[in-house]
Swiss-Prot record:
Record-given protein name: Organic anion transporter 7
Known glycosylation sites: N39, N56, N62, N102, N107
Alphabetized UniProt keyword annotations: Cell membrane, Glycoprotein, Lipid transport, Membrane, Transmembrane, Transmembrane helix, Transport
SUPFAM superfamilies reported for this sequence: MFS general substrate transporter
UniProt keyword annotation of Transmembrane helix present: yes
Pfam family, one: MFS_1
Major place of residence: membrane
Membrane topology: Multi-pass membrane protein
Amino acid sequence: MAFQDLLDQVGGLGRFQILQMLLLCISSLITYPHILLENFTAAVPGHQCWVHILNNNTDSANATGTLSPDALLRISIPLDSNLRPEKCRRFSRPQWQLLNLNRTFPNITDLDTESCVDGWVYDQSIFTSTIVTEWDLVCESQSLKSMAKFLFMAGMLVGSIVYGHLSDRFGRRLIFRCCLLQLAITDTSAAFAPTYLIYCSLRFLAGFSTMSILTNCTVLIVEWTVPRFQVMGMTLSICAACLGQIILGGLAFAIRDWHTLQLVFSVPLFVLFLSSRWLAESARWLIITNRPEEGLKELKKAAHRNGRKNAGDALTMEVLRSAMQEELEAAQIKSSVFDLFRTPNLRKRICLLSFVRFANFMSFFGLILHLQYMGSNVFLFQVLFGAVNLPANCVAFWALNHLGRQVSQTLFLFLLGISILAITFVPQEMQTLRMAVSALGIAVSSVTLMCSFAHGNELTPTVLRVTASGFLGIASNIGAALAPLLMILTVYSPHLPWIIYGVCSILGGLVVPLLPETRNKPLPDSIQEVEKERKDSRKAKPEGTFMKVTQF
């Protein structure tokens, strides 16, 4: 008998689990868009230097008479190499001679120019305000915009480590509620930040709590459902996050002011925090951490809400201890992250898996965090990317079961790299083609992530699987944090970050064949089993345990 048998007695998927799952999925739906908010709140609108004669309507009317805005622009702003008005330079004084195009005058490149000492004028046709227009994060300060995204992702990295440990020590429910409140306060406050430094600090704290919320949503769903319903619960959580992306695109289209959009996704978190008081703590965690009385109380509460009062009354401490004997013994075995590197074969697997996860997450977040670089209609891109992630689950299921782990990851990582490189060199004018290639890249990146998760779980021994998942998660989050930081390289070349994303994906595809295939192979239970394995030589045991991948 095991804990899953206790759950079967109190109801494997009853009203209690459905209500719990509903609240957690809503939390995923509202939380996930906070990762992508800066696609809109930090969008860069068209801009040019503020010029007295051009942008001061009263003075320009008095001084220039009937000159059109285009004529005023011509004498005030120089042209760049593409014959478009410069965004970061202006003429030191009006160049009246440029009005007469037939007249001979010195080379335009010899005319005196200066930086935008009086600030900028922004195009408000798409975004009425963003953090870029609020704090002039353009030209010499454009790298600061990438720093805001980097700090949020760095917060996710640090938060996943800190809150992951605290969740195991103090409980999933408590940390989940604390993180909901932290995200609500910090991102609501960010909408009113008086300076850019304060805004970045608040976004770092918001990222600190975001990953913990998403992780604990999945953990609480898994720990309160029996195995046959766990994949369904996790799938619903993933679909809720995808739906959150679609809703973000729609609301951002309707709300073009960054303060309002920030509040629309932050204020509902206060309601979720208040609602989460009815969320149940994981009974499994309570029992394993030597709090069996509280665990028994939660199980009886679940039985009562599921309409199984008799089953709840039959639960006693003796029954509980008997059912949880194996789990309690397993919990006494303490593992360390250093155990992952003590033996050569496991060390090799962890290092290779870490690079694959790093490259995969860098490319994935490089795509989803920088929609504006892919095309003009960022709202449609956001909705499309959320939509293509839904069928990606089915593609991953088919690939894992028919192509295997090695082939599927290698194929889709190569395809991801090629897609990103194609986006880089497709002209901006070919918007339909850019949109199609970008959507393909997002779908493929989602497939590779799911394949990587499955492969990683099957390559690590049972005694260290959770520890290995945590370490690989750190490698993943480092890649995610570096993705926005690489956009600083656009000052040297607009294509350079995208080339790095694409090349990293291809390198990841080259690394995957160095890992053993695990399809229909027994899961290793100990480090010794991992060390005895040889690539392509281990025979599957008919009676062995293996991981079955479903469409969920």
